[in-house]
A protein has these predicted regions:
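Conserved nucleotide-binding/hydrolysis modules and their immediate coupling elements
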Residues: 1-81
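A generic structural motif
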Residues: 29-31, 65-74, 127-132, 348-349, ...
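Active/ligand-binding-proximal structured segments within catalytic/core domains
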Residues: 36-52, 78-129, 379
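Divalent metal-coordination and catalytic microenvironments
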Residues: 43, 103-105, 129, 198, ...
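Functional cores that coordinate and move charged inorganic groups
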Residues: 91, 111-221
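Glycine-rich, acidic loop segments that terminate in or are immediately followed by a histidine
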Residues: 195-207, 304-408
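A conserved active-site cap/scaffold subdomain adjacent to cofactor or substrate pockets
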Residues: 201, 205, 213-262
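Hydrophobic helix-and-loop "lid/oligomerization" segment in the mid-to-C-terminal part
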Residues: 241-343
Length: 408
């Protein structure tokens, strides 16, 4: 059995321990000590990190009454049975802030909205809290956050102690764990009391700012993302810097940012609408120009055979669609070799719906010249391949096909 020093003194950073067992976990050396400061992963809280005899701890595992310390490498034999352990205090105190903050937040939601906590996870950057509530409003979240931070400001003592099962049943606990033996209680004076095995701050004031970042509905639950203490300060730093920089670039007050962004988004929406209308007019103009410049065959059919190098595929596709919509006796054979696109080749064959040519069949035959594949409808088909230098051969093949077809 390993004595858990963090139960008695969560602020203890360095300790001496006696090696009880040396084992292997996942091929890595591991130690079981008679006592330890290292908290194992449990109850939604990750394990502590740190060093034993200067060797890095990579994991801390709870195995019944034993605490297993998994090491990056073996320790020197010269140390004998006694070793010195030192925890990563920054990580430990961060976990204390987050876990105590969760207790405050859970109690706030329970008191205000009768929303029980279902689960809690202490992540590396964000903590999550799942509460039983069908829906939640911004105002409800705000009230819970305000209450939580008021409890922080009151600097209430956080008391940790053990009770037996009989005493636990008498306490107004949110949930009684099914474990046998004594139960560890974490109590925030005149605010919350619950069973918990984690490490906690000595007072609510040490938790620091509690900030709910976002929330979302998960079935019959609500999941809240939140941070506490130094994490909140870090979050405030980058957000404040971002707001300051954007405000300076726009030469406005930071309090005007929301209003200005709304106006800019509306202006962008209008600009995009105007740009779309201009592009549509230009597309129609270009389509008419290509139709007018194309030669008329003996049977009245126009053939437009063109390689596009300054347009992307979507632009050419829209233009070709415009052409066959404007003229009921036109055939378009288009190749696309655009700048800035992924290397390769694309061809697009189309004809007016009134014409009964099989563009799908033709595109499959011409696609061989670009080492590609494709298909589509009888009047509109496309293909893509990896041989860009074969585009002109594909277009010439298709043009010869139509010239021979028309002669017949």
């Amino acid at each position: 059995m390993s004595k858990r020093l963090y139960y008695e003194e969560p602020y203890l950073q360095k300790f001496k321990g006696k090696i009880l067992e040396k084992i292997k976990i996942g091929g890595k050396p591991a130690l079981i000590l008679d006592n330890t400061c290292f908290y194992p992963t449990s109850g939604g809280q990750p394990n502590d990190l740190g060093y034993i005899q200067g060797v890095s701890i990579v994991d801390v595992i709870e195995d019944n009454e034993k605490i297993i310390h998994v090491l990056k490498e073996g320790i020197e034999e010269e140390c004998g049975d006694m070793v010195i352990g030192k925890i990563d205090w920054e990580r430990r105190f961060d976990h204390m802030q987050q876990h105590s903050g969760q207790h405050i937040l859970s109690a706030a939601f329970e008191k205000l909205w009768n929303a029980d906590t279902v689960s809690f996870n202490l992540g590396d950057e964000i903590c999550t809290l799942d509460i039983m509530k069908d829906n939640i409003t911004s105002e409800e979240v705000k009230k819970a956050e305000i209450l939580s931070n008021n409890i922080v400001l009151e600097n209430k003592p956080i008391k940790v102690y053990f009770v037996d099962q009989e005493k636990a049943n008498e306490l107004n606990l949110r949930k009684i764990p099914p474990q046998k033996g004594d139960i560890r209680i974490v109590e925030i004076k005149d605010f919350d009391i619950c069973a918990c095995c984690g490490t906690h701050c000595g007072t609510t004031g040490e938790v620091g700012l509690i900030k709910i970042l976002k929330w979302e509905k998960r079935g019959v639950k609500i999941r809240l993302d939140f941070i506490c203490g130094k994490r909140s300060l870090k979050d405030y730093y980058w957000k404040n810097e971002l707001i300051k920089n954007i405000s300076n670039k726009l030469t406005i007050k930071d309090t005007e940012l929301g209003e200005v962004v709304e106006r800019m988004l509306e202006e962008r929406k209008e600009t995009r609408k105007e740009l779309r209308e201009i592009k549509e007019k230009l597309q129609e103009y270009e389509a008419k120009r290509l139709i007018d410049e194309s030669s008329i065959r003996d049977n009245g059919i126009r053939i437009i055979n063109k390689l596009f190098e300054e347009k992307n595929f979507q632009e050419v596709r829209g233009l070709v669609q415009e052409i066959i919509n404007l003229d009921d006796s036109v055939v378009v054979l288009a190749g696309i070799k655009s700048k800035g696109e992924v290397e390769g080749a694309k061809i697009l064959f189309a004809c007016s719906r009134a014409l009964k040519y099989d563009m799908n069949r033709l595109i499959r035959e011409a696609g061989k010249f670009i080492e590609g594949r494709g298909g589509g409808a009888p009047n509109f088909a496309q293909a893509g391949g990896k041989k860009a230098e074969g585009i002109e051969d594909a277009l010439n093949f298709a043009l010869e096909h139509f010239q021979e077809f028309i002669k017949k």
